[in-house]
Amino acid sequence: MPEPGDMTARPPSDDAPQGDAGPLTPGQQAELAAANERAQKILKAGRVATFNGWTIGTFGVLSVLLGLGSLTALVVGAGLLVVAWNELRGRNMVRRFDPAGARLLGRNQLGLMGLIIAYCLWSIYGTLHHPSETIRELEQVTGGPGSVTHLVAWGYAAVIVLSMLLQGFNARYYFARVAQLESYTRSTPGWILQLQRATSGLRQ
């Protein structure tokens, strides 16, 4: 029986009798500290996803607000908002040590890559075949027919390459965390996982 006024209960342990209650033993404290240390590398993926989610969401909102007269901008903005939502949803799953969260984040980055590539290809097509009035005016000033058009097209091509590198790296980073999460959940006592999941909302 715990002493009167002692409200600290020992979490259920895979190695301890279920009816036992009381403060954590030194052994359990050491076990919890070691588990928290091992979890830091995994939880870093959640912090990366937080940054990605809010950054992508900001661009999505701006695309929608600034592109109210453009169907392309609205579609891209809506796509970015979906990606941002999935990024934050995957972040929450990773914080609960759910391997499916890292898998979702990896696929989400591939989806973002596809969205960016599709937008850039569409923009290249429009630039080459239906150049805007601004591009035509610039070419009249520079005196080089097609020079600005091709420069803009090459700019979009560079964005495609950059997205393949950046989103490809992020996807690989997230997918690598799937095996780490699976290993962590297998090797960590159930009471520690339960405690960590219960406090997942407190993490930054």
Give residue spans per PLM region.
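Topology signature of small-to-medium multi-pass alpha-helical membrane proteins
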Residues: 2-204
